[in-house]
């Protein structure tokens, strides 16, 4: 019988997390469940910092970026001694289950606590869109809008100065944001971690475009592939074209969530309560073909793989 649960946000924040918190709280209250907000992710659970949330506690947060509960990375959770303290705090607080909003690292933490007997439901909250078992993660579409706005502005100045602009996009090891940004932003080149990248190949393509009369270009690249400032210098040296690199950085994580992220987060938050009431307690939520689904969190973190969007890449290559 689920009477009292905790909700936390973990790892990198993403726009829409507040909407998910709101969804969990209000759906829980509608079923007579007490919901406690745990501050700063797993760290707050370790330190036993939590507060009872009411209907009014989550008023006026659906439109806010970030997370009102705070977030953190807490790799110490992998230690047996730390997990023992966490489980003791869960027991002392009489929490029957946890709802954990975050990325794949947060899911691993949820899996570990589930293994120790605490029912956990994972909700995918990350702009990277790199979580298995879901087409989209909370925050992805808002981050994409932020990136497109930046690319549009860079195109204005790149066109004026006839220069090449490199835009580094977040995503870790997933190129979804970069591919989508390249299509929506009209980028001339796209570089993602899923495909092998050679700087000289890019230079050759830029030279070909220049020979065809192209006077400026935008290159979208996922983070961690290379040093974009070194890449800019290499391109400038090889082509003679002024080249500048822009790292969008953490600005991509901020801002008011767009409507789709608010709706997705609200649906997933409410669905987490539905799953707990049905007896699920080792699962993560996803959306596939616009329908909410759930998967065993062990499968999602160990065996399932995020499907690569070859269709988007094919489109990007045709248009770039």
UniProtKB/Swiss-Prot annotation:
Cofactor field: Mg(2+)
GO cellular component, one term: 6-phosphofructokinase complex
Residues bound to Mg(2+): 104
Class of the enzyme per the UniProt entry, highest EC level: transferase
InterPro entries reported in the protein's UniProt record: ATP_PFK, ATP_PFK_prok-type, PFKA_ATP_prok, Phosphofructokinase_CS, Phosphofructokinase_dom, PKF_sf
Record keywords, A-Z: Allosteric enzyme, ATP-binding, Cytoplasm, Glycolysis, Kinase, Magnesium, Metal-binding, Nucleotide-binding, Transferase
E.C. numbers: 2.7.1.11
Pathway in which the depicted protein is active: Carbohydrate degradation; glycolysis; D-glyceraldehyde 3-phosphate and glycerone phosphate from D-glucose: step 3/4
Binding positions for ATP per the UniProt entry: 12, 73-74, 103-106
Binding site for ADP: 22-26, 155, 186-188, 212, 214-216
SS bond list: none
Regulation: Allosterically activated by ADP and other diphosphonucleosides, and allosterically inhibited by phosphoenolpyruvate.
Compartments it resides in: Cytoplasm
Gene3D superfamilies hit by this protein: 3.40.50.450, Phosphofructokinase domain
GO biological process: canonical glycolysis; fructose 1,6-bisphosphate metabolic process; fructose 6-phosphate metabolic process
Keyword Transferase: yes
Main localization of the protein described in the UniProt heading: cytoplasm
UniProt GO MF annotations: 6-phosphofructokinase activity; AMP binding; ATP binding; fructose-6-phosphate binding; identical protein binding; metal ion binding; monosaccharide binding
Keyword Metal-binding: yes
Annotated transmembrane regions: none
SUPFAM superfamilies, per the entry: Phosphofructokinase
PANTHER family: ATP-DEPENDENT 6-PHOSPHOFRUCTOKINASE, PHOSPHOFRUCTOKINASE
Record's function text: Catalyzes the phosphorylation of D-fructose 6-phosphate to fructose 1,6-bisphosphate by ATP, the first committing step of glycolysis.
Oligomeric form and interacting partners: Homotetramer.
Family membership: Belongs to the phosphofructokinase type A (PFKA) family. ATP-dependent PFK group I subfamily. Prokaryotic clade 'B1' sub-subfamily.
Protein's name according to its UniProt entry: ATP-dependent 6-phosphofructokinase
Origin species: Blochmanniella floridana
Phylogenetic lineage: Bacteria, Pseudomonadati, Pseudomonadota, Gammaproteobacteria, Enterobacterales
């Amino acid at each position: 019988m689920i009477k009292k649960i905790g909700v936390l946000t973990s790892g990198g924040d993403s726009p829409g997390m507040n909407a998910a918190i709101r969804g969990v709280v209000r759906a829980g209250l509608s079923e007579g469940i007490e919901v406690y907000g745990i501050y700063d992710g797993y760290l707050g659970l370790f330190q036993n910092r939590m507060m009872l949330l009411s209907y009014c506690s989550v008023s006026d947060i659906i439109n806010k970026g970030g997370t009102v509960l705070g977030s953190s990375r807490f790799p110490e959770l992998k230690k047996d001694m730390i997990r023992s303290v966490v489980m003791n705090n869960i027991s002392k607080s009489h929490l029957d289950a946890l709802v954990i909003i975050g990325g794949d690292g947060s899911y691993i933490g949820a899996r570990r606590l589930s293994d120790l007997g605490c029912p956990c439901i994972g909700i995918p909250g990350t702009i990277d869109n790199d979580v298995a078992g879901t087409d989209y993660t909370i925050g992805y579409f808002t981050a994409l809008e932020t990136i497109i706005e930046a690319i549009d502005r860079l195109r204005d100045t790149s066109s004026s100065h006839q220069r090449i602009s490199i835009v580094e996009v977040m995503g870790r090891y997933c190129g979804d944001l970069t591919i989508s940004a390249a299509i929506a932003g009209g980028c001339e080149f796209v570089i993602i971690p899923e495909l092998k990248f050679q700087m000289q190949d890019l230079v050759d393509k830029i030279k070909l475009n220049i020979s065809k009369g192209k006077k400026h270009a935008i290159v979208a690249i996922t983070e961690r592939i290379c040093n974009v400032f070194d890449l800019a210098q290499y391109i400038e040296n090889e082509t003679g074209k002024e080249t500048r690199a822009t790292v969008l950085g953490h600005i991509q994580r901020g801002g008011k969530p767009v409507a789709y992220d608010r709706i997705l987060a609200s649906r997933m938050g409410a669905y987490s309560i539905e799953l707990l009431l049905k007896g699920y307690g080792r699962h993560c939520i996803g959306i596939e073909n616009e329908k909410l689904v759930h998967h065993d969190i062990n499968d999602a973190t160990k065996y399932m793989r995020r499907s690569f969007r070859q269709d988007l890449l094919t489109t990007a290559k045709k248009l770039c």
